Amino acid sequence: MQLETSYLGTVKYKQEDIIVFQGGLPGFPEETEFILLPFNEQPPFYILQSVRTKEIGFVCINPFLFWPDYEVELADSVVRQLSAESEQDVAIFVFLTIQQPFSKSTANLRAPIAVHAKKRFAKQLMLDGERYSLKAPIHTAGKGGR
């Protein structure tokens, strides 16, 4: 199948590439199916692209590459909702807000995305407390960056 995207133009994908967010993402309840695409084939950056709407795509990263001490404890209910057997079945990503220059970009460490890589279910989480920032500067990554 082919998909038009704002960030990457036309991309090919398979049905089994689709990640399902039951109930959608906060603010986008109608958007339940996404694919995770490497951004210009340059990990660690990815695009979480809506299958339904070309204009809805989010830049995201694996936060552990930038903030090694980042911690996400998944509630048992979340593990079950993702049809996972344990937390080890789940990959974590965070959304970026890209700014110019790039050094002013930020990551939302308080609301990560949990993705069951094999079963392709996902959920956006909201971490309790003030430990992590909604706008953690990328330039502080690796320095605590909370």
Curated annotation (Swiss-Prot):
It is found in: Cytoplasm. The keyword Disulfide bond does not apply. Disulfide bonds: none annotated. GO terms for cellular component: cytoplasm. One of its GO terms (biological process) is regulation of translation. Keywords: Bacterial flagellum biogenesis, Chaperone, Cytoplasm, Translation regulation. InterPro entries: Flagellar_assembly_factor_FliW, Flagellar_assmbl_FliW_dom_sf. The keyword Chaperone applies. It comes from the Bacteria. SUPFAM superfamilies: BH3618-like (SSF141457). Acts as an anti-CsrA protein, binds CsrA and prevents it from repressing translation of its target genes, one of which is flagellin. Binds to flagellin and participates in the assembly of the flagellum. Belongs to the FliW family. This is Flagellar assembly factor FliW. It comes from Shouchella clausii (strain KSM-K16) (Alkalihalobacillus clausii).
